Amino acid sequence: MEYEICLEPSGIRFMADERQNIVEAAKQHGVAIKYGCASGSCGDCKGTILSGASEQGPFMPLLLLPTERAAGMAILCKLYPRSDLRLHAEVVPKDTWMTEITRLTPLAWNVLELRLRPEWPYPYRTGQYARIAIPGRPDQWRSYSMATPPDTTGELVFHIRELPGGVFSQWLFHTAQRGDALTLGAAQGEFALSPDNDRDMLCIAAGTGLAPIEAMIQESIALGRTRPIHLFYGARKRADFYHLEELARWSRQYPHITITSTLSDMQDASWTGAHRLLPTVAASGHWKDHEVYLCGNPGMIEAAIDLLLSHDVRHDHIHFDAFAPNG
């Protein structure tokens, strides 16, 4: 059965099948509701139910505070209509940028650094991500965080992990060449450095979740800020790591930056560093007065946040970007 969806304040209307979530239905009708992961992990598609009946599907619980739930807020990529609905939802401009691949550099056995040069300046804030259209499939997009803060070169840098069967990552690893064109959507996301405090920073990054964390640390360095930063960077096995030399150079050059690399594979005897699951970092109890930044898979982030909250870290001091496999 289909229902009419009305978005406020834009007044845009479209039909949605009861089996479609709101974001899917909007895309089908050419309506660009702001969203990110499309899997209930990031919270970019928060909206408010103004009237009508709906069913909320599963999402990461911490995305909505109790006060937000009470106010009728919902995660639209997991919201299904059960009657006509009026929703307050952000509709984003359909701005796109044409870019050119300037470099493809292997970082690890399954990670590439992708550098793009946009035809026009591409505005973004450190920590945000861009949506990239899959070549030959203009209706399909993949989201990746920028790995550097905005700079005078204008180049955009991404860390892309190859996923078996991932349409975009397979094209990038096996077909793409320097000079190929890619289309980007406008930058999105609220994951960013808090500008109004000088609290010590705890950063936890898993895999290519290192990208926006690196960008934040680079920005902090460029601004001349010297508040202590402790980065825990985790991977499953040693071969999954990348940028270890660059991170080590930061810790040598800047005394306020501490880097701890840790493996979750306890059987890797060749690794002489730390062996621990990333969420257990949060259990040490030393982070109560820190500003915390996490980026990685939803399971890691949920577990880490639960531990942080249980050790008296304030909810509003925790910032995260959770991403599902994206290839």
Which residue stretches match the model-derived regions?
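Short, conserved phosphate/pyrophosphate- and ester-handling motifs at nucleotide-, phospho-/glycolipid
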Residues: 127, 209, 297
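Reductase modules of NAD(P)H-dependent flavoproteins
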Residues: 1-79, 84-85, 228, 232-327
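Conserved beta-strand elements of the Class I
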Residues: 201-202, 293
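A short, basic/flexible loop-to-alpha-helix module at the beginning of a structural domain
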Residues: 186-198
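Short, surface-exposed secondary-structure boundary micro-motifs
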Residues: 50-53, 90-92, 135, 187
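Ferredoxin-reductase
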Residues: 95-181, 198-199, 235-237, 262-266
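Histidine-anchored nucleotide/phosphate-binding helix
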Residues: 210, 214-222
